[in-house]
């Protein structure tokens, strides 16, 4: 089993991933995907599955064992890719379950968009974890950034809707290429954040 497969297995079978799926499914079922509670919980729940994985490896000392068995690049990419996938699924999977099995009428939601939004916030949380060496900042930092972006876009930067978190999931503006335009933007953000994560972890390993 390579580094990525091991990380993905740890992420998807972690208690925090299961907890996140249950929480989001409850919110979607009792309220709706469009509810304010769902919107607020997205960056928080997305941070749960695997954003602090590198911190745990560092504090336990396992990182040295991992780096003996795998290349540095494979180790770092395995961490961030597993984080992105698990964070995306913890948001999109509950919506899919609700649409398929719990909704009064079967419906289709923008699952790819919700997956990408979750992946983005999970990667942001992972960057914060490495940058601050603090799990609490990782779990709460994405929410703070999301909230600041909401305030900025609603009060001061109304025309800059491409950085408005709610607009990614529930568009009110006319997007170039419509949903595909939002997908491209989110993928671009994710790639940038992943690159930042890679460089931060690489430097941390080098300095250790």
Predicted regions and their residues:
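Short, membrane-interfacial amphipathic segments enriched in basic
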Residues: 1-4, 117, 121, 160
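Aromatic- and glycine-rich beta-strand/loop motifs that create alpha-glucan
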Residues: 1-20
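Positions in alpha-helical segments
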Residues: 6, 60-61, 126
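Short loop-to-helix capping motifs
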Residues: 14-15, 70-71, 133-135
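Secretory targeting signals
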Residues: 20-53, 78-135, 168-185
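Terminal transmembrane helical anchor/hairpin motif
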Residues: 28-35, 104-109, 136-208
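Transmembrane alpha-helix boundary/anchor motif
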Residues: 45, 49, 53, 58, ...
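Helix-loop-helix units of permease transmembrane domains in multi-pass membrane transporters
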Residues: 51-85
